[in-house]
Amino acid sequence: MIFLDNRQDKIEVTDKLEKIVTSSIECALKEEKVNFPCEISVVFVDNENIKDINRENRNIDRVTDVLSFPMLEYPESKVFKEVYLNYKFPEYDMNDGNLVLGDIVVSLEKCEEQSREFGHSFFRETCYLIVHSVLHLLGYDHTEDSDKKIMREREEYILKKAKL
């Protein structure tokens, strides 16, 4: 189950955007072998809101493009398909039978800025950030160069599969 919550008024959230975001998440989950019914919440915000959330949660007082709030814990350098593929989840990880993976907060205003900066569409930039964030929910990280390379390869693979 994917919940989309628009809390900004700078960028119009169209049916097309909602559909592309949802299909990007579904593709990432499929490609990462998440075979449980699961729940992810996506909150659309503007730059001011994401800056506040970034400061409150990470003590970083600046605008960022996307924030991920995973609900599951992972051993270092392990991802969902390595840890939880055949795992029996306890009830507290579930919500109405859905595995709660976590929350994504994305600044659509920043997506628009970055799409112009990188020379591709707003939809492509938004979906890239959504896939990036889903991978964080699934245990991927990019603090080490080797992990960053793996994560980047997965992002591009998933975007290609999603035809974005």
From Swiss-Prot:
It holds the Pfam family YbeY. GO terms for molecular function: metalloendopeptidase activity; RNA endonuclease activity; zinc ion binding. Keywords: Cytoplasm, Endonuclease, Hydrolase, Metal-binding, Nuclease, Ribosome biogenesis, rRNA processing, Zinc. Binds 1 zinc ion. Its EC number is 3.1.-.-. Belongs to the endoribonuclease YbeY family. This is Endoribonuclease YbeY. It comes from Clostridium kluyveri (strain ATCC 8527 / DSM 555 / NBRC 12016 / NCIMB 10680 / K1).
